[in-house]
């Protein structure tokens, strides 16, 4: 498990399978064979936490439907696991349409250690509509009070609109054999519901060529499964999906007056909608290529999230890290011996930001048995203080009993900012 991971991780990212939490999937949630892969991943993280090597930041990505999947039980299970391991947690729902002509809403759950100072500009006091939609707010309100107490609303700046439309990513010069026949296109139109036919008629009468998308959606009926051709004509592509899901391959719809033509989206067009560079080497087969797109996260979304939130948080977690990598290597041996050890003068840091104080601060590392570490962290969470402050208060009481003054804090280690 975690023994094969060296040192302390600044950031851990997991995009666990969405098949069982997606609208297009089986909806069995984190109990499902695919999406349940979260739990083996989490077992590794828990081992790192117990070894004193908790990752500074944890980022989890999945489809937006995770918020309500499995009767609404999956989201609190994930958030509760993070909080139980000593993290504060927040989440954002980001649509790739903010960056690309591609509607792709994904939830990003971001957690950071309880003791880490968070820059004020990375937080907002109240949820914002752009990234904290109503279903997320309701799910947070329904969390147990002890878990909700550790919730954060992350601040993410909105990007500048790119202005790119679906027509801008369409490949020209598609050979005649790449288009559907008139009969195939007529069959798709016949599977549109009245609302989609209205959209099609609007494109026909717009007076200019229009490009839209169709995706085939299957529904279970009493008398069998029915298929519908869902249309989008607003210059943004519908979400690219796995080609073997209940919602099938993406189809492009071209309308110019009474002329209506359809064809499958090309791999190059799909890559552009995911924000991949033209030089990106794609698989050789259609299904393998769109399998990548269906499983993937839009590139500019991750880049924006990393630059504006994840990297600043990782820097903060790294600066707070209480031990050196060399000291971490001793943790496993201490756990085997069953000892509690205090190693002084592991690191020293010059005092720069406290007027009137000169010299250096001395860092110490406390090694605890896993069960004791867990017990103390839970107590710290209940008291709404950092683990450091919890231990320091115990030291203050012993000093007071011996007629000595409490320990002077070089930096605030009480309730962490943003907690």
Where are these regions (language model features)?
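Class I S-adenosyl-L-methionine
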Residues: 2-11, 19, 23-232
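Short acidic/His/Gly/Ser-rich catalytic and metal-binding motifs that mark active-site loops
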Residues: 18-24, 249, 282
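Short, conserved micro-motifs enriched in small and acidic residues
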Residues: 31, 35, 292-300, 385, ...
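C-terminal target-recognition/interaction regions appended to catalytic cores
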Residues: 173-323
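A detector of short terminal or domain-flanking linear segments
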Residues: 319-360, 371, 419
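Short amphipathic alpha-helical segments
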Residues: 364-368, 376, 384-396
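The alpha-helix within a helix-turn-helix
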Residues: 380
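Short, positively charged interaction helices/loops
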Residues: 400-419
